[in-house]
């Protein structure tokens, strides 16, 4: 059995899909479906069982055996960069992750987990997986950074696989439940389909991010499980492309609309990553050599998925 925490969420459900595509269906999804809309991410997928996150954590902390576990993909976390409840964030992202990590270490179960480019904070260059480059801007980034630091202490003595992925700006299918935290491509598509002018912040041609397609993210996760390699790795494309490029690809697909530029909100000033670009040196040195989709390629594929029933 393979466990996917956050399996009804954005990246987790795409990992479930990638496993299904390889014929793997013996999957336990762990999630919190209090926000009931997330179930739609699983309706076209095949899993063996579902467990609520709280029940799962109780079993993990009690040391209860959950059966023959091949691997754990730990994608479950609070991923809101605008959540400022530090206790909630540390309990949810740090303590929970530590409990699950030790459960896996004691049983030599491969543990693949979601870290984040938010660990780098407001850098404009050198997004490198090393302490001197890490300075998170928000409590979400700090919770991810602290767990990475914890993993670094354990890695030299670990007898089983531990691998963390610093996700950059992931976009693609199955993110609709994220609301305001969904990608720009998702929001632009919604605005166009509602007959509105798609909106970007003023200066969006200067805001550049490493936008990585979620299908590529799932592929990297599965490749590492097969390779057995450990470490903490950036997971982006290695390219910085502008929000304007995302909009251009969206408009090109729809063949209509023009962008309305809106003022940059004061509340985001100083807390907003204006530039991200993954350094892929370590990922490539680990042996992962597949190409990553460009914004034009990924957004086009995503638009086709979003509008498949249109």
Swiss-Prot record:
The keyword NADP applies. CDD domains: ADP_GME_SDR_e. It holds the Pfam family Epimerase. It catalyses: ADP-D-glycero-beta-D-manno-heptose = ADP-L-glycero-beta-D-manno-heptose. One of its GO terms (biological process) is ADP-L-glycero-beta-D-manno-heptose biosynthetic process. Its cofactor is NADP(+). NADP(+) binds at residues 10-11, 31-32, 38, 53, 75-79, 92, 144, 170, 178. Keywords: Carbohydrate metabolism, Isomerase, NADP. Pathway: Nucleotide-sugar biosynthesis; ADP-L-glycero-beta-D-manno-heptose biosynthesis; ADP-L-glycero-beta-D-manno-heptose from D-glycero-beta-D-manno-heptose 7-phosphate: step 4/4. The keyword Zinc-finger does not apply. Substrate binds at residues 169, 180, 187, 201-204, 209, 272. SUPFAM superfamilies: NAD(P)-binding Rossmann-fold domains. Binds 1 NADP(+) per subunit. GO terms for molecular function: ADP-glyceromanno-heptose 6-epimerase activity; NADP binding. The active site is at residues 140, 178. It comes from the Bacteria. Belongs to the NAD(P)-dependent epimerase/dehydratase family. HldD subfamily. PANTHER family: ADP-L-GLYCERO-D-MANNO-HEPTOSE-6-EPIMERASE, NUCLEOSIDE-DIPHOSPHATE-SUGAR EPIMERASE. Catalyzes the interconversion between ADP-D-glycero-beta-D-manno-heptose and ADP-L-glycero-beta-D-manno-heptose via an epimerization at carbon 6 of the heptose. Contains a large N-terminal NADP-binding domain, and a smaller C-terminal substrate-binding domain. This is ADP-L-glycero-D-manno-heptose-6-epimerase.
């Amino acid at each position: 059995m393979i466990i996917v925490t956050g399996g009804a969420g954005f990246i987790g459900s795409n990992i479930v899909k990638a496993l299904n595509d390889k014929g793997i269906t013996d999957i336990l999804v762990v999630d919190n479906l209090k926000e009931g809309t997330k179930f739609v991410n699983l309706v076209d997928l095949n899993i063996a069982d579902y467990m609520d996150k709280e029940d799962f954590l109780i079993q993990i902390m009690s040391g209860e055996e959950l059966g023959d576990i091949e691997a754990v993909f730990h994608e479950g976390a609070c991923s809101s960069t605008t959540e400022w409840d530090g206790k909630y964030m540390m309990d949810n992202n740090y303590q929970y992750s530590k409990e699950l990590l030790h459960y896996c270490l004691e049983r030599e179960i491969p543990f693949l987990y979601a870290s984040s480019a938010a660990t780098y904070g407001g850098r404009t260059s050198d997004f490198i997986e090393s302490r001197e480059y890490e300075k998170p801007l928000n409590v979400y980034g700090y919770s991810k950074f602290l767990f990475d630091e914890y993993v670094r202490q354990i890695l030299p003595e670990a007898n089983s696989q531990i691998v963390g992925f610093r996700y950059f700006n992931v976009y693609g299918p199955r993110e609709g439940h994220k609301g305001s935290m969904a990608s720009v491509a998702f929001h632009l598509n919604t605005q166009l389909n509602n007959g509105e002018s798609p909106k970007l912040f003023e200066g969006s041609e200067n805001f550049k991010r490493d936008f990585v397609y979620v299908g590529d993210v799932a592929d990297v996760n599965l490749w590492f499980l097969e390779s057995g390699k450990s470490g903490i790795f950036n997971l982006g494309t290695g390219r910085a492309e502008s929000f304007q490029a995302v909009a251009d690809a969206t408009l090109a697909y729809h063949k209509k609309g023009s962008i309305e530029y809106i003022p940059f909100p004061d509340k985001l000033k100083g807390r907003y990553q204006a530039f991200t670009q993954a350094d892929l040196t370590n990922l490539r040195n680990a042996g992962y050599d597949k190409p990553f989709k460009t914004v034009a390629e990924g957004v086009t594929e995503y638009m086709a998925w979003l509008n498949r029933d249109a």
